[in-house]
A protein has these predicted regions:
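Alpha-helical adaptor scaffolds
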Residues: 325-339, 345-394
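Solenoid-like repeat scaffolds
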Residues: 57-63, 96-104, 136-142, 171-179, ...
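Generic helix N-cap/helix-start motif at coil->alpha-helix transitions
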Residues: 64-73, 104-112, 142-152, 177-187, ...
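N-terminal leader/linker segments that initiate helical-solenoid repeat arrays
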Residues: 3, 26-133, 144-148, 425-450
Length: 450
């Protein structure tokens, strides 16, 4: 009999996605948005080469004149010193002195680029976005500058949780990029994840993972997590397991042992389910009481009650498993199944004492009977019946009759058997016990008469 169904708690465990775009983008943008008016490089993570333009189109980019360069450098110094008011005033004066027409397209693009940095630093993302849009609207700016800016625009939309516009901006960047790197594919995947287009999200994160594998590089843990979640959402259990097994190869953490155990359960691979959870347990990873209880259930399902009992006993003693009736009941039942009646009794005593109903006292009485403690069995079962909530009072009264019989309280035993026999489910057994008791009493009478 299967005691435990992992599906009840599989979904909550796997719905947590370790990577969300908005959580990752803001710190990255803060690191990347340093203003460099003379630089055309796309900000990238150190381990990846900067993407190149898809086509080497010829652009006649105007020169940056010395007097404009000097003003931009002055504004940049103020911005880097966090004197944003002074930086903005310098830029305002540059435009006001001769109007926008006094600046060529490249100079104006650099002015808007620095405006965007100032607005971003002030956390005014709407104005920052508008300024960046003004950068890319200028004709004949360097391709690398346009690529960098379009990528930043996409990131800012994601920071604002404007997922669809972020996706559209990022796709524009992809269109003009010859060799998008893996991080860009992950960013696009996160955008699609947020708009619940899981197929496209999965395609892009898998592309990123494959790109790293092709270079013999270890894909990032967050990427695997995003793929894992997306496969689970598509109800592709086999692929979810594949990803979890890869995670365990490179990032052998507790959460992945627990999750893959759940997934093996979904695949009805009970041996693998137990082995995965046991691996986490023996390494001391299962520090939560609920996880230890799950471990015990898996042992019980596998007909290894002794190990289940040991898990429960250890957790209850060290306090990691909650001191409540249900947990003591599991421990007591496991010890009993393991034929350890003496250890089962104190656990079930605690379970019964903490329960609001009499069922556990009835079960405790049964265990007392197994241990030949007949008087205690009588007391426990009567207490359970008086308390109420016994699932099968007829069964409890049968056991009560046996305890009275073994304690030589024959009249009370007869009453208990008769009471049990009023329920048709126990009538046959009650009648058999009464006949057996009558024959035994007759035998004892004849022996006494000599």
């Amino acid at each position: 009999m299967k005691l435990f169904d992992s599906r009840i708690w599989t979904r909550p465990a796997l719905l947590v996605v370790a990577v969300l775009a908005v959580q990752l983008l803001l710190p990255r943008l803060q690191a990347e948005l340093g203003y460099a008016p003379l630089s055309a490089a796309v900000a990238q993570e150190n381990e990846e080469a900067a993407p190149q333009p898809k086509e080497r189109e010829t652009r006649r980019t105007p020169a940056l004149r010395n007097k404009v360069y000097e003003k931009l450098a002055e504004a940049q110094a103020a911005a880097e010193a966090k004197d944003y008011n002074t930086a903005a005033k310098i830029l305002d004066d540059m435009i006001a002195s001769g109007g926008k027409k006094s600046l060529n397209s490249y100079e104006l693009a650099n002015v808007y680029n620095l405006y965007a940095f100032i607005h971003y630093s002030r956390e005014d993302y709407n104005k920052a976005l508008k300024a960046y849009e003004n950068v890319v609207s200028q004709p004949d700016i360097p391709l690398a500058m346009e690529m960098n800016t379009r990528f930043t625009i996409a990131q800012l939309y994601f920071v604002q949780e404007n997922w669809q516009k972020g996706i559209e901006a990022l796709l524009q960047w992809f269109d003009m990029t010859e060799n998008p790197n893996a991080n860009a594919y992950v960013l696009l995947s996160q955008g699609y994840y947020q708009v619940k287009d899981y197929d496209k999200a999965l395609k892009n994160v898998e592309t990123a993972i494959d790109m790293y594998k092709a270079k013999n590089k270890l894909p990032k843990e967050q990427w695997y997590n995003l793929a894992r979640f997306l496969y689970f959402e598509k109800n592709d259990i086999n692929k979810t397991v594949d990803v979890l097994e890869e995670l365990l190869t490179y990032y052998p953490k507790k959460q992945y042992w627990v999750q893959v155990s759940h997934m093996y359960g979904e695949q009805q691979k009970e041996k693998e389910q137990l082995a995965a959870m046991e691996t986490a347990y023996v390494q001391g990873m299962l520090d939560k009481g609920t996880e230890q209880v799950t471990m015990a259930y898996l042992y019980l399902n596998a007909d290894v009650p002794y190990k289940a009992a040991k898990v429960m006993d250890k957790g209850l003693k060290d306090g990691s498993i909650d001191d409540k009736s249900k947990n003591w009941e599991i421990a007591g039942s496991a010890w009993r199944q393991a034929q350890e009646v003496e250890k089962s009794i104190p656990a079930m005593e605690k379970a019964a004492a903490r329960s609001d109903e009499g069922e556990l006292y009835a079960r405790l009485g049964n265990i007392y009977l197994d241990g030949d403690q007949h008087k205690k069995a009588i007391t426990a079962i009567n207490k359970g019946l008086q308390k109420g909530g016994v699932k099968r009072p007829d069964n409890a009264r049968l056991v009560l009759g046996m305890a009275y019989f073994n304690d030589k309280q024959y009249a009370k035993a007869r009453d208990a058997f008769k009471a049990a026999g009023r329920d048709e489910r126990s009538a046959k057994y009650a009648e058999q016990w009464i006949k057996y008791m009558d024959s035994e009493l007759e035998r004892q009478k004849k022996l006494a008469e000599g």
